[in-house]
C-alpha cells in the first residue's frame, strides 16, 4: 500500500472520545451532567473566585503578610567596628561602600555606627553618608 495523506491515521490512544454531557441517562453523563448535585456550582455561568476554597479560610489569608518596605527612609547601617576595610579607605564615598557591602539599589543613604565612626567623619566625601550622632 502506498503511503499518502488519505491513508494517515492518528496513533493509537492519542485521540480521546468526546465527552457529551446532559444527553440522557444511558450516556452515563445525563441528569446532573457531571456537575454533582444542586447548588451554586451546578448552575450555568458559575466560576469560583481565584483562591476560593469553599468557605474554608483561603491559603493567601492564612499565611502571614511579608515583604513590606517602608517608603520613609532607606538608610543602610554599617558597623565600623566589625568592618576593618572601611577604616583602611582613604576617602569614604557612597560608591566605595556599595562596592564593599553590595547593598540594594533602593538604598538612599548610609549610616556608619560604632565607637570609631566619629573618627572617620573627616574621610567622608559624600553627603549621603552620616556617622552615628550626626543628623
Swiss-Prot record:
Region feature (Disordered): 21-66
Keyword RNA-binding: yes
Keyword tRNA processing carried by entry: no
Record function comment: Binds to the 23S rRNA.
Protein name: Large ribosomal subunit protein uL15
Native organism: Helicobacter pylori (strain HPAG1)
Signal peptide bounds: none
Quaternary data: Part of the 50S ribosomal subunit.
Record-level GO cellular component terms: cytosolic large ribosomal subunit
NCBIfam families given in the database record: rplO_bact
PANTHER family noted in UniProt: 50S RIBOSOMAL PROTEIN L15, LARGE RIBOSOMAL SUBUNIT PROTEIN UL15M
Family note: Belongs to the universal ribosomal protein uL15 family.
GO biological process terms on file: translation
Annotated keywords: Ribonucleoprotein, Ribosomal protein, RNA-binding, rRNA-binding
Amino acid at each position: 500500500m502506498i503511503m499518502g495523506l488519505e491513508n494517515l491515521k492518528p496513533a493509537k490512544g492519542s485521540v480521546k472520545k468526546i465527552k457529551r454531557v446532559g444527553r440522557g441517562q444511558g450516556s452515563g453523563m445525563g441528569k446532573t451532567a457531571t456537575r454533582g448535585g444542586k447548588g451554586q456550582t451546578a448552575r450555568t455561568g458559575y466560576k469560583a473566585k481565584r483562591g476560593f476554597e469553599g468557605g474554608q479560610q483561603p491559603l493567601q489569608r492564612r499565611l502571614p503578610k511579608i515583604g513590606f518596605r517602608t517608603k520613609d527612609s532607606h538608610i543602610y547601617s554599617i558597623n565600623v567596628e566589625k568592618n576593618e576595610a572601611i577604616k583602611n579607605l582613604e576617602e569614604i564615598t557612597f560608591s566605595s561602600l556599595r562596592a564593599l557591602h553590595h547593598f540594594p539599589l533602593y538604598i538612599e543613604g548610609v549610616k556608619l555606627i560604632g565607637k570609631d565612626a566619629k573618627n572617620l567623619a573627616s574621610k567622608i566625601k559624600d553627603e549621603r553618608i552620616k556617622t552615628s550622632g550626626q543628623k
